[in-house]
Design a protein with these regions (language model features):
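Amphipathic alpha-helical coiled-coil/heptad-repeat segments
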Residues: 1-55, 198-251, 367-413
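Short glycine/proline-enriched turns and hinge-like loops at secondary-structure junctions
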Residues: 72-73, 91-93, 270, 288-291
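Non-catalytic DNA-recognition/assembly elements of restriction-modification systems
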Residues: 41-66, 193, 242-263, 267-278
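Short beta-strand/loop turn elements enriched in aromatics
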Residues: 73-91
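A short glycine-rich beta-alpha junction/loop motif
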Residues: 36, 67-70, 140-146, 178-202, ...
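A short beta-sheet element
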Residues: 81-83, 96-166, 278-343, 349-363
């Protein structure tokens, strides 16, 4: 999408990054710089020659999964479900959640072995139909009825095949095979019609190894983020609970102004100029602002009930998002006090009145300990330093993900 920008009295059409990349590729192809034929844009230099187009049925034998009775679950051999396909970079025996008791015949008919590919049969959205994953463990598992197994019969590198099936090129060929139903489904016949391009086995191994190493680094990064978030939560709880005895408690409504936004949740604009805070964790965009202040934004309902954002500047807000501003104490200290104390208050009100949203009195009457200014500033500075560290780690995780998506676009055809 091209963005129009004002430059004095002239309007300049500035192409976005995707358009710029495509322009570069088109230009390179015209000048003979882009590889021609069945080869990817990005390739290890030691490999040459075109890739071979093969049907999935030339490499895999397809079969629908097992539908055990409910009393068979909870013991026995590991049982691969759709969630195991979606929630893991690769499937190993230990990462499979469910177990099932099967007969010897069922084990023979529905076994999953190293190198087999598992496909999601049904999805509520067309974009997710036919999602796939590879089983890379030496231990035998079985698979469920909402899964299609591709039993390995041809030569391929399992890791390469896994990443190929996640590439935009493969998704464009698989998705149409699941169209045309209320719940989008793909069957063995549809998968058998899909044709994809395969490198020679040595090139497959190198591509699969490189991308698997990137996935390992991304998994490590996620662990770093999880540990850091846990540390931050623990330190915040320690700091606030340390203040419970010996300091004055005040009503939140007495140290700030509490209002809400006025807009519907669907008021966002794709390329709007200002942040638009709803009950989602991240703000959307909008073309108009109703607030120009330093504030805490608290989600008043939905899945992220009680989620707290901080913002300083011009913004707008959803009618069920609470806007807290004009603080008489350190706003950053209050933010962390609320992160500790508000979930407890919400849990109490949910259990007593089953209220799935925050009412004004929930916030206004919430009492929080207020230490002296020096203590407030110390806690605020400490927690902000951890937030900066977390932001750095989250940005690095986002960078790894963008790098992976780029490689999936450029290293496959």
């Amino acid at each position: 999408m091209t963005t129009t920008k004002n430059n004095g009295h002239k309007k300049l059409n500035v192409p976005n990054k995707r358009e710029q990349n495509q322009t570069c590729l088109d230009s390179a192809e015209r000048e003979g710089l882009r590889p021609k034929g069945n080869v990817p844009n990005l390739r290890f230099p030691e490999f040459q020659g075109e890739w071979e187009e093969l049907g999935l049925s030339e490499l895999l034998d397809f079969k629908n999964g097992l539908n055990p009775k409910p009393n068979k679950f909870g013991k026995g051999i590991k049982f691969i479900s759709v969630m195991d396909i979606l929630n893991n970079a690769v499937i190993t025996y230990d990462c499979i959640k469910a177990s099932v008791d099967v007969t010897e015949k069922e084990l023979a008919d529905f076994s999953v072995e190293k190198g087999d590919i598992l496909f999601q049969r049904s999805s509520e959205t067309l974009e997710d139909v036919g999602r796939a994953n590879v089983y890379i463990d030496d231990k035998t598992a079985v698979f469920g009825g909402f899964v299609i197994r591709g039993k390995k019969k041809g030569e391929y590198d399992p890791q390469y095949f896994n990443y190929l099936l996640r590439s935009p090129f493969a998704r464009k060929r698989i998705i149409p095979m699941g169209a045309g139903a209320q719940h989008f489904n793909i069957g063995q016949e549809g998968l058998s019609k899909v044709k994809l391009h395969f490198a020679n086995i040595e090139e497959q191994k190198k591509i699969g190894k490189m991308l698997s190493l990137l996935d390992e680094r991304m998994a490590t990064q996620n662990k770093i983020i999880d540990k850091l978030q846990s540390l931050i939560k623990g330190i915040a709880q320690h700091c606030i609970r340390e203040l419970i005895n010996g300091w004055e408690y005040v009503r939140l409504g007495d140290i700030c102004k509490i209002t809400t936004g006025k807009l519907d949740a669907n008021a966002q604009v794709e390329n709007g100029q200002y942040p638009f805070f709803t009950c989602a964790e991240r703000p959307f965009n909008i073309d108009s602002y109703a607030f120009d202040t330093e504030a805490l934004l608290i989600s008043g309902n939905g899945a992220n009930l009680g989620y707290i954002n901080y913002y300083k500047g011009k913004f707008n807000a959803y009618q069920r998002t609470y806007v807290l501003d004009h603080f008489s104490v350190n706003i950053q200290y209050v933010k962390w006090a609320l992160k500790v104390l508000l979930p407890q208050r919400i849990a109490i009100e949910k259990s007593s009145s089953n209220t799935p949203y925050i009412v004004l009195s929930t916030l206004a009457d919430l009492k929080i300990p207020i230490p002296n200014n020096s203590k407030q500033n110390h806690i605020a500075d400490l927690m902000m330093s951890f937030e900066r560290k977390l932001s750095t780690q989250l940005a690095l995780s986002d960078l790894y993900n963008k790098q992976k998506q780029y490689l999936l676009r450029q290293m496959f055809i």
